[in-house]
Regions:
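A structural motif
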Residues: 1-361
């Protein structure tokens, strides 16, 4: 329950040199242009793609310097609206007391709303308990999931007519500080997390309803490695590293038990995207290898028996990359280079193709 103390030993706020950024921080607007979002200088900044393919920025958003920690979680709905969630120390509070803050960008390149507090699952001033994950349901309502002080999961959801519901305690204990939220093909939200003893999923069965916790599935999981994607069936597949260092897939709605796919390239989180190449659906997985360089592996979507091979290493990066399709369906990847600046690359042709030359935005 949320009133018990179970704070994780490691704080994943990020640092000025290595920001913590999660979710859809590479976004595509209704006009097809891309945006990149990162935490910087106590706030959040944005780079925006122009009509000619060039980039402008960085530009402060959400009211400029808002005293934020270097952590940013991003979600985007089908309406193109980008929801940003940061962590902010509580003014006058004790050290390590934080609240979650939210902003929305409605249109590519346009100003975002001022940061507004959505408090914390345990109250207005509670210590860091986990890094939020954001997803947007089928009718445009944002859901902000966060590990709470009892080690379970809480969520705060937007109302239809504006404003927010109170924090809902979804129960659980000893969950991963880095949960992964995703919206399925029915427009309902799901939350995937790991536990010391296995895997756990929270599922929304009706529009706007509180997600429900399912039974723990025993499995050897490495915390902090999970990613998830909606596939061509509309069902979600979660990916994670097991304790033998293998990338595994799990899709409850498809009846897919935890299935090893390939030896992991490194130890950190996975990023996953669904893409279509010549009419064939593929799942692309990205990870930092043991040397800190980004690598990719692809297989036909929802065919977990297919062979996977990691690509040749790309540039050295900080943290996992972001992946998405551009307006023409081509693959785009974004990452934070070793020096702290964002870099992007476009995919090449073919189902096994990976992003090509990387360039600074």
């Amino acid at each position: 329950m949320a009133n018990r103390s179970e704070a994780p030993a490691t704080h994943l706020h990020g640092s000025p040199d290595t920001p913590q950024v999660r979710g859809s921080w590479l976004a595509r607007g209704k006009d097809g242009r891309l945006s990149v979002y990162l935490p910087r200088n106590g706030g959040a900044v944005r780079w925006t793609e122009g009509a000619d393919g060039g980039w402008s920025g960085p530009e402060a958003i959400g009211g400029g310097s808002g005293g934020l920690l270097p952590s940013l979680s991003v979600g985007q709905g089908a309406d193109g609206y980008v929801h940003l969630v940061g962590l902010r120390p509580v003014a006058g509070g004790e050290p390590d007391r934080v609240e979650l803050v939210h902003s929305t960008q409605y249109q590519t390149g346009r100003p975002a709303l001022e940061w507004r507090s959505i408090t914390h699952p345990n109250g207005a001033a509670f210590r860091w308990t986990g890094t939020p994950s954001v997803t947007v349901d089928g009718i445009g309502r944002a859901y902000v999931f966060c590990r709470n002080g009892g080690g379970g999961i809480s969520v705060r959801a937007q109302k239809d007519a504006g404003g927010w519901h109170p924090w809902w305690d979804l129960l659980g204990s000893k969950t991963d500080p880095l949960p992964v939220a995703v919206t399925n093909g029915s427009g309902f939200v799901e939350l995937y997390s790991s536990h010391a003893a296995g895997l756990v999923r929270y599922v929304q069965r009706e529009s706007g309803a509180k997600p429900l916790r399912e039974e723990l599935l025993p499995a050897p999981v490495t915390m902090g490695t999970m990613g998830a994607v909606r596939g061509p069936s509309g069902h979600v597949t979660a990916f994670y590293l097991d304790r033998e260092g293998r990338v595994c897939a799990w899709s409850p709605e498809r009846g897919l038990a935890p299935t090893p796919l390939v030896d992991a390239a490194g130890e950190g989180p996975l990023t996953v995207v669904h893409r279509s190449v010549d009419g064939v659906d593929h799942t692309l997985i990205a990870q930092r290898d043991a040397s800190g360089r980004v690598v990719f592996a692809s297989y036909p979507a929802e065919r977990e028996g297919a062979e996977l091979r990691w690509s040749a290493p790309g540039p050295e990066v900080q943290g996992p990359p972001a992946l998405r399709s551009d307006a023409s369906g081509g693959l785009v990847a974004a990452a934070v280079a070793a020096g702290g600046e964002p870099i992007v690359a476009r995919g090449q042709d073919g189902p096994d193709a990976v992003p090509g030359a990387w360039a600074r935005v």
